[in-house]
């Protein structure tokens, strides 16, 4: 009898262990890229850097498993399209067509099938944009609350109906409901923030009315940052950051006369103020999550500030067993490597355009390259997408050299970033010719390439014999397509 009981107990334990995993079999149809990026939960939170890169096999199928003690939100990115699913423990068979509309792109065989489609169709407009749009519709607190409540109820009704029809589970509905409610809470608090900053601008005619000041405080008081379920929602980090940086860090001190404005030209000072704000204004697991998210987000900007190493060391000291730390550490290693490279001299093939500070127009700059075909990369030290393209620079450099073509990098940075500009040339090993714009050249580029009022980068050009032949060239990541485009002008 004892042996039978033991056998049954082992069977139950084994079954329970299996049930705590989710296994997905995904068939990709019409994908243009074999690479698949999967973002998984970490320590029951939505933590962006907890991602894995995989590739599907020859028949375009990918099978992977992950620990799933409860329903888990995962993201799957392929061929420029991101899908999200709330996956319960067990087996899931999935077909994805990245190039199709949502209704046709997903065939989900598993729990909450109809809910998965609705989840991918849900409005994901960034909450700050929503706040701006609501402000265009009404200028009173009560009016804005009514508008948002109506929209929130409409979004929730889709999933309430599915729940009533037993097409989604209660855990699925709860996760979606939490995310929608956080989205609208973040939107609501973003409205006073926008009015606060608009009223602070020089010569501003915007009045930050008392009713909005009162509403701002009431929102935070009614929804304190203590619910761990919020750590799985899309907007929680930014919602908490605005509370810490602007409500607690600026508005309240201004109200009671204790505000001391940091020197925001000192990036290190800004980072320290924000980090200390998170440390002071939150507690427990929420505090750990927010500090980790802050460090990752700032390291991700790839500005390589040394103070981030100090702050990460402090985080490690406070949370020696944090599950978030391993995802942040590789970024810290890049900061160390960056400052090591900054000590070195420029490579022989890293050259600066002669008297570049005196070049005021694109025509003057192009005249420096008569008789040459030149691929031009317009970038800046603060531009993440620009720096992401540097990954493909070595292959591009080989192609250009084989064709006796030149490379020109135009930095849109201001004088304050001069040192960092030169350091990044070394760190990213940017072989070719370099120039940083002065105010006149900046304006001339905006006039010629954009609308004269602003610009968007990265931007790529092709020059031949001192003349602009393509003003919107392909990116280095386009590889062969770009090489063909350049070859047409050799």
Spans of model-derived segments:
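A non-transmembrane, solvent-exposed segment enriched in polar/low-complexity residues
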Residues: 20-175, 179, 187-188, 227
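Conserved redox-active cysteine motifs that mediate thiol-disulfide chemistry
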Residues: 378-395
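N-terminal, charged low-complexity regulatory/assembly segments
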Residues: 142, 146-273, 277, 281
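N-proximal helix/coil linker or "cap" segments that precede and/or mark the start of modular domains
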Residues: 296-372, 423
